[in-house]
Amino acid sequence: MVSIVNIFMDYWFAEIITIGNEVLSGKTVNTNASHIGRRLTSLGFTVRRITAVMDEVDEIASAFREAIDRKPRVIVSSGGLGPTWDDKTAEGLAKALGVNLELNKTAFDMILEKYMTRKIPITEERKKMAYMPYGAIPVENNEGIAPGIYVYHNNIDILATPGVPREMENVLENFINKMLRNRSNLKYLEDFIYVENVMESSLAPYVKELVKKYDIYIKTHPKSYEMSHPILEIQIAGSGKQEEEIKVKIEKVKFELLDAIKKLNGIIRNSL
């Protein structure tokens, strides 16, 4: 797979942590990391690392601690905020930050209101979702019960979201719209070319040259076997302060790639 990272995106690093035994065992496909990655990328961040860990306090704490040590601008986690015994993200994050886990009154009021509206009593298990690291700010979850957890630590925006995809997406958007402090001033744009009958290895030299020439991100995604009717999805992406400049650069790259594909007897498709 041909991939060279655009150097001017590096300053705005982000990291993603997925928490859950079901992800590690393969029972659950990690679609949350994919969504979070694309959303952060659209904001101008470069996602440097995605980590998946077990539902264990020490594992979770270690993942957060190591991510913090790498000093990204943003860390987003998913999973482990529910009412069951194995939901341990809040405790792990508190341990990583070196602070106590405490009942967050604002979070408790959010949870209480949702259960009271449905005339459902509060149990210790339901109350558990209101425990957060000292100093944390709860993030509204309009699709479920457990609020997200937001902490600003060492100039890093840290967000913990629930594992249920629709809840994760909602909490992430609420965080972006209301709380995110580290905002890149870069614009991010991407485009795609779909081609048949060109092997990835044949196109690789052209991609390498264009990356050097235009300082842009180009990635080829094989959609079939290299030696048997090859099909490629080619991603062209760029970021910068001026949107029009990025558009022009992408169009120039597309033009030269299409010329290379023609020389290699490739067939352009509108989609896959």
Swiss-Prot record:
SMART domains named in the record: MoCF_biosynth
Superkingdom of the source species: Archaea
InterPro entries in the cross-refs: CinA, CinA_Arc, MoaB/Mog-like_dom_sf, MoaB/Mog_dom
UniProt signal peptide: none
Protein family: Belongs to the CinA family.
Protein name from the UniProt record: Protein SSO0103
